[in-house]
Swiss-Prot record:
Entry comment describing in which tissues the protein is expressed: Expressed by the venom gland.
Localization in the cell: Secreted
Taxonomic lineage of the native organism: Eukaryota, Metazoa, Chordata, Craniata, Vertebrata
Protein name: Veswaprin-b
Keywords carried by this UniProt record: Antibiotic, Antimicrobial, Disulfide bond, Secreted, Signal
Signal peptide range in chain numbering: 1-24
Region of interest called Disordered, as start-end residue ranges on this chain: 23-42
Source species of the chain: Demansia vestigiata (Lesser black whip snake)
GO BP annotation list: antibacterial humoral response; innate immune response; venom-mediated disruption of cell wall in another organism
Intrachain S-S bonds: C43-C64, C47-C59, C53-C68
Any one GO cellular component localisation term in the record: extracellular region
Protein role: Damages membranes of susceptible bacteria. Has no hemolytic activity. Not toxic to mice. Does not inhibit the proteinases elastase and cathepsin G.
Domain WAP residues, every copy: 27-72
Listed Gene3D superfamilies: Elafin-like
Length: 75
């Protein structure tokens, strides 16, 4: 190996040895506690299918919420 390559290798090894561990073991803990988990709205199941909705409304799913909504007509 040439002296330039050896010097480069030595420099890279020096930089690697100086890096902080990725795990963050040397970092101090942040003060305080985590706040309580935010309340999510309860899952509401107003309908199971379109036929359980009044008139022309359709049963629409938004996450865990099922509700009857007026349909949209596209031309």
């Amino acid at each position: 190996m040439s002296s330039g390559g050896l010097l480069l290798l030595l420099g890279l090894l020096t930089l690697w040895a100086e890096l902080t561990p990725i795990s963050g073991q040397d970092r101090p803990k942040k003060p305080g506690l985590r706040p309580p988990r935010p309340q999510k709205p309860p899952c509401v199941r107003e309908c199971k299918n379109d036929w359980r909705c009044p008139g022309e409304q359709k049963c629409c799913r938004y996450g865990c919420i099922y509700e009857c909504r007026d349909p949209i007509f596209v031309k």
